[in-house]
Each structure stands twice: as structure tokens, then as C-alpha cells.
Amino acid sequence: MHSFLRTVGFSNITSRKELDKVLGLVMTHPTLDKHAFSSDDSHHKIIERSLDFSERMGITIRGEYDDKGFFHLEHYFPYLIGKKSGGYQEVSIFKRVDTDAYTGMCDDLRFGSSIIFYLQNSVDYISSKEESGKEMPLTLSGLSTSGKILLPILRTAEHVRAQAADSEQHVSLLQAAREGDENAINALTLLDFDTYSMITRRIQNEDVYSIVETSFIPFGSESDNYTILGIIKEVIPHTNSLTGEKSTEMLLDCNGLDFYIAINDEDLLGEPQIGRRFRGQVWLQGKVEFGKNKV
């Protein structure tokens, strides 16, 4: 069973027979139906069908029709389609070795490192034959199976302005450093040293979550899994139309990047409210709008 099925309201599926019933609904009553033809000599028809069990949240199945017209299920996954685009990003796409799926990667200067995500719309990528490495609109989202609500850090208006200015300066320095600017590289080194010194000093008397407001850290052996700490900007309740299970969707500000995540209410500790923070593990997903390259 897919471990994130519970996020979209299927925590009680315990057997393959129960799962097949749900996947059968996706196959016969899809909300979205896409297809493409494989690039190899067989030219098999690749099918991608999705069924929403709540708004923008559900299950996608992917497979192929053979020469005799029989459908072979290759892969399925739960999803949450985000509502907030992260803007144009230079995205590279890679086929996964372990399954018939694709992974996306982009560099975001707000993090200073690469972000890796599971590609939701693989059939769009196959049919578009788009080359990797181009700037295209990207919308990120995440599914979580464990999370807690934390209180916010008390911030004055002056502190918010100063933090925004520091963040803008940091992005500018990272951009310059990528282009080989030695002064920017030295400035970033000094900033890292100052940050380390500040944390070392404050951690003696304060909790780490009073010092660190948001974070985005790779988690576990899967490259698209992260431990995140983000500020809640919107809360949306969901109810699975088939099972009645309740989930919560939240818009998070994480290191200056806004994206939506969802979690089953049974897996969430605390009451989510705007201004509070969410901490948990997420499986990061992304939808790329292929063919809409930045001019």
C-alpha cells in the first residue's frame, strides 16, 4: 500500500482487494483523463487518470494498453494539486529507476540548494517531449503523514521588514556567487559564520524553534521527502467523498517559498490556525506546465 494514501482519506485500506476497488473507481470515473504514446518502438498508449475525492485531492493511476487492448497498471499515487504557482523555475526531469515515474529538480535561490519533487503530470512531459533545463511554471505541493502545530515566534513590524531585507540580500548574494563573484562568496561565508555564532549563543538558553522560524531539510532515503517548518497562511478543511475521512490543507510560508500541504486530521497534533507554524515530514510533489517556457 502507498504510505500516503491516508493523507487523502484512505487510512483504512488494509488489503489489495480494497485498494483495487478504489483504483477501479479512478479507472472508470476519472476527473481527469490524459494519454500519450511511448517513445520506444512499441508506441504503446500510456494512460494517466485522476479522480478527486476532495477538491484538488485524490488518486492518479498510470499504465499502458498493450497490442490486444488490455490495460496494465504500472503505478498509482495520491496527490494534492497546489493552488499557488512558485513562478518560473529552471526544471530538470529524470525518470526514476525503481518505478514508472519521474522526478523533477530545480534550483531555488531562497534555499541555496536544489529542490527535488515527484512529478505529478508525467504524461504531459512525455507528450510534450519538452527538454529539461528550461524555465517553466512550477506549482509545488506536499503530502504529510505526521505533523505538529507550533506557536509562532513573536515578531515586531520592524523585525519583519529587517528579515525581508536580509532575505532579499541573501538571494542577491547567492545569484552573484553562482556567477563567480568572489566578493559575494566571501560575504556568504561571513553570513554563515555570523548565523552559526548567533545560534550557538542563543541555544544555551532558548529552544531551537524559538530561534529558527522556518526550515526545509531533506529527510530519509527518498530524495523528494523533507522535514519542513513553515508559517501557516491559510487553512482549508477537506472531507473524502468516499470514506468521510477528514484532512486539512494548509498554505505554508517556508523560507520565503509558499506552497500547499495536506495531512489527515488523525495524523495532526494541535489546531492549525493562521500565524501558527506546522512542523512535519512531507512528500514533495510538483506540477510543471510544459510548453509554457519563459521567453
Language-model-derived ranges and their functions:
Residues I231-I261:
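OB-fold (S1/OB) nucleic-acid-binding surfaces
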Residues M1-H43:
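N-terminal alpha-helical "arm" segments
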Residues T243-E245, I263-E266, N293-K294:
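Short coil/turn segments at secondary-structure boundaries
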Residues N264-G280:
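Short nucleic-acid-contacting surface segments enriched for D/E, G, S/T with interspersed K/R
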Residues G230-I232, G275, V282:
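OB-fold and OB-like beta-barrel modules that bind single-stranded nucleic acids
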Residues F219-I231:
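Short coil-to-beta-strand transition motifs
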Residues S38-G220:
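Long, hydrophobic alpha/beta structural blocks
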Residues W283-V295:
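Short, Lys/Arg- and Gly-enriched loop/turn segments at beta-strand edges
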